[in-house]
Amino acid sequence: MASQVLVYPPYVYQTQSSAFCSVKKLKVEPSSCVFQERNYPRTYVNGRNFGNSHPPTKGSAFQTKIPFNRPRGHNFSLQTSAVVLKNTAGATKVIAAQAQQAHVQAPQIGAWRNRLHFLEGPQRCGLKRKSEELDNHSSAMQIVDELSILPAMLQTNMGNPVTVVTATTGSKQNCTTGEGDYQLVQHEVLCSMKNTYEVLDFLGRGTFGQVVKCWKRGTNEIVAIKILKNHPSYARQGQIEVSILARLSTENADEYNFVRAYECFQHRNHTCLVFEMLEQNLYDFLKQNKFSPLPLKVIRPILQQVATALKKLKSLGLIHADLKPENIMLVDPVRQPYRVKVIDFGSASHVSKTVCSTYLQSRYYRAPEIILGLPFCEAIDMWSLGCVIAELFLGWPLYPGALEYDQIRYISQTQGLPGEQLLNVGTKSTRFFCKETDMSHSGWRLKTLEEHEAETGMKSKEARKYIFNSLDDVAHVNTVMDLEGSDLLAEKADRREFVSLLKKMLLIDADLRITPAETLNHPFVNMKHLLDFPHSNHVKSCFHIMDICKSHLNSCDTNNHNKTSLLRPVASSSTATLTANFTKIGTLRSQALTTSAHSVVHHGIPLQAGTAQFGCGDAFQQTLIICPPAIQGIPATHGKPTSYSIRVDNTVPLVTQAPAVQPLQIRPGVLSQTWSGRTQQMLVPAWQQVTPLAPATTTLTSESVAGSHRLGDWGKMISCSNHYNSVMPQPLLTNQITLSAPQPVSVGIAHVVWPQPATTKKNKQCQNRGILVKLMEWEPGREEINAFSWSNSLQNTNIPHSAFISPKIINGKDVEEVSCIETQDNQNSEGEARNCCETSIRQDSDSSVSDKQRQTIIIADSPSPAVSVITISSDTDEEETSQRHSLRECKGSLDCEACQSTLNIDRMCSLSSPDSTLSTSSSGQSSPSPCKRPNSMSDEEQESSCDTVDGSPTSDSSGHDSPFAESTFVEDTHENTELVSSADTETKPAVCSVVVPPVELENGLNADEHMANTDSICQPLIKGRSAPGRLNQPSAVGTRQQKLTSAFQQQHLNFSQVQHFGSGHQEWNGNFGHRRQQAYIPTSVTSNPFTLSHGSPNHTAVHAHLAGNTHLGGQPTLLPYPSSATLSSAAPVAHLLASPCTSRPMLQHPTYNISHPSGIVHQVPVGLNPRLLPSPTIHQTQYKPIFPPHSYIAASPAYTGFPLSPTKLSQYPYM
């Protein structure tokens, strides 16, 4: 009995770049080292890969003796006879490959698990490891494995092992094998009722069929088609899979993270299932990375997405029953990293139709109730998911049993024996356990290796890399060595929560096992435990990566959701209304809209769909409100202010129905509208639900003026007219878009960028100036302001993309920044004017300088070292300076040094009280080095009889492969800060520190302001006097003016502060630097007043912790927050200051519940102005400020770890 085989060289299927992973292994386990000889059929080889224009003939054969599911490090035998291939000329070459019982050692890396490989590398499809005993050796088998013993002429320079494929003989005339597999030919056409598909490549073969890569003719879509066997033994399970996929097709596949099935049809009596094409499965991803452990920040989004899928399946009463790395696919590793979907429902079943003693799941991920023959439910999927995340964390299967006995033995040794009540009920308990009755009380014990081998004849083998006595020991494996400070503490806390969740997922008793819904609420997933480290680079990276799993709704959702867009007009008596439907929005893309201003979105910034990497969306409906005064074809009334609002649901594509993996490119004019009435255009997300706020005990009079709004109207409509006097929720802006306006603004948020005006009177090519201002701290017990660090950023119009340059980057460079600011104001505009000590009131009835261009602000051309202290001065125009002093004299008894232009760089007049003290905070800098983590193994590894995989993952939190650029952080260097050593301070470059009041620009006043770097040695600042080695420079930062007119405009522009978890009721002083809280610089607007509400529309009172007193006739003050709880042990590093060098702040989702311990999330009142405040998530090289006047607000990077109310993030990348 000879065997027929075909040998596939390594370059076969080399062109494949992606695969739909639904191929499965046989349900066999080795009963001996050699299988019985079988007859196998011939099959076609992909002729294109051999250079043939047609598939070659069937070829020859040799015999294999391969132990299936062999453990790592064990040997196998192979007998070969001959390999026959057909060349391009048609001649046959017989390659003698005689090998008498060739003894081959299994590879140590890449072959540690007993996997069958059809393809190599990313081309290999995930194969099922259905590991069931080989009770019937005459049953049909398909064996595929990697071999590397073929002759040298079959080897290529790639060095990949050749793949050997075997299949049964006896092909029928209907192109179906004896086992029911359909024999495919390349470029064969598969026809459904609606579409035709051309076969491009073979992707893989499994238990229930095979998968091919196909092209949907007439389109540019590539799909994966699973062709089921027509064998009677697989017919019923195929029908179950089809019915489950039909049920899942009614759900949103992107929202619930499972593969989308398009259609099902019959082709020559074979059922064909059409799926979306996915990129790479997790096993191939691990293999590609040499099976290096993945960091927890990467495991978390994978866990969250798979748990979301399991939660949906559980709600539908479905069991996946084959969850493993091969069945978790990366959608697009390049465009959507760590975005995964669950595939392969070939083993799925309904929970009501489960049968005990059924072999389900791959053996490594098989739940104890399946092994013991207990009744089971959806909990088996949670066990599998626990094994998967443990494998991702270890880089190795947690329980890699070669036999079911080994599997339950590994589980029992690590987690203890199953409960007696489980063993008593299990139908297969006696296979692995024996009951002892000779003792005082009867009990179960695990059979010894000798007893099991004597009963079954199968010898147990050790295949574990790590032998754990407890799951708690998992936290001590692969420790990260390159973390320090708060990053190290955050990593340790993350590991503790990971192990806590893992233990709940791997509970032997299925009734006690955690559910998918509980998993999503676990601290490891929602990252509550990381809130104690808000300024840790590691935590920033965790939140940023976690945001990716929320990016699931995109333009492709229209295929599953037939929702009509809701269009709501602005409810205003002075504004016209417009109602349109989705068809009108579609025509909006193609028509050319004439504009009197620039379009909202510029062609230079590509916008991605909702599933983009940084797009944050969820099931919560979010909207886009476009508020132009007029749209083309609709005449605008010039006699009164006009505005329209168009609401588009997030499921409606804005430009094109592109696939999720394609970025959306919005052309100029798509959102362009015709302007009139000098109104402003805004892009504002409308929030449909808001976290309820606690009842207020103290009321600010200015908030009551805004009036109350119905909760139903919250976030639904915004009136955009000449006077911004409405109330608008302020979201946390996290996506890449910038809208510009040349309007002078005073802001206290972190990113401040003055963009290039669209046009200037002299048509000059102006440069832009950007300042990254770190927010200021407020001292609860004392009225002192602590300086945050800040850094300059160079914006040059000659460079296509500007970048925020940190002090580390600009070391040794000459930096010159010029800002051309065009001021603009409406007639009868009202503003507010104040200096750092006193507030005066005046009105500007006629602002005739609305179009007057401001003079440039020049930074002195001096070397900018890595550490520098910058003094803002205004000594270029003495006459104007004196004029300012004459207009604003301090009323306080103490002389204001800021007003006298003699302010020392380390002394600043308090923004809250004229009699407050002057202080600064010393600062250091911590910059984790982006070095690779060294290979580290645990002590338990010595107990393993298996070799370890070379190398470990490079999971540095600040390296080049981190989603965040390398960032530095200011560490508190007070005396009692234990975790910051003097050695660290000396060896790391210190960050430049300066006290920066609100930067205010005044209409009608033109001044040249010079900013000079005057310090080259950064030392801790000494309270009340200048530090040694520092130059004292006069500064007029406190001499700028604002206009204040009414009690409504005198509202305190306070940034709501979110407390850290664990902050205690203790007055801050110099010895408790880590306990101080952050207060934010209030913003000032020198244009039309636009007030934001604090909380919901009907929330007119401020919270108790926002209560404050006013002084000097209603001068705005900074209101501190009281502490609420005691600090944790990690607190000294948990409350370090943020670094100005952070290029991209952390993204967080509202569901992480980053708020007060009571769950309160506060609104951020921010003064709006038609001027650019770009999103902080914009990359250093992606910002091109060439947009017209628009109102936009960016969230502060100092809010990293704290979401702003409303609690939902924007779905759109440009919101």
Curated annotation (Swiss-Prot):
Origin organism lineage: Eukaryota, Metazoa, Chordata, Craniata, Vertebrata
Organism: Homo sapiens (Human)
Region feature (Interaction with UBL1): 870-880
Sequence segments annotated as region (Interaction with FAS): 796-891
Identification of the protein by name: Homeodomain-interacting protein kinase 3
GO terms of biological process kind: apoptotic process; mRNA transcription; negative regulation of apoptotic process; negative regulation of JUN kinase activity; peptidyl-serine phosphorylation; peptidyl-threonine phosphorylation; protein phosphorylation
Disulfide bonds: none
Region: SUMO interaction motifs (SIM), residue numbers: 866-918
Covalent cross-link (Glycyl lysine isopeptide (Lys-Gly) (interchain with G-Cter in SUMO)), residues: K1208
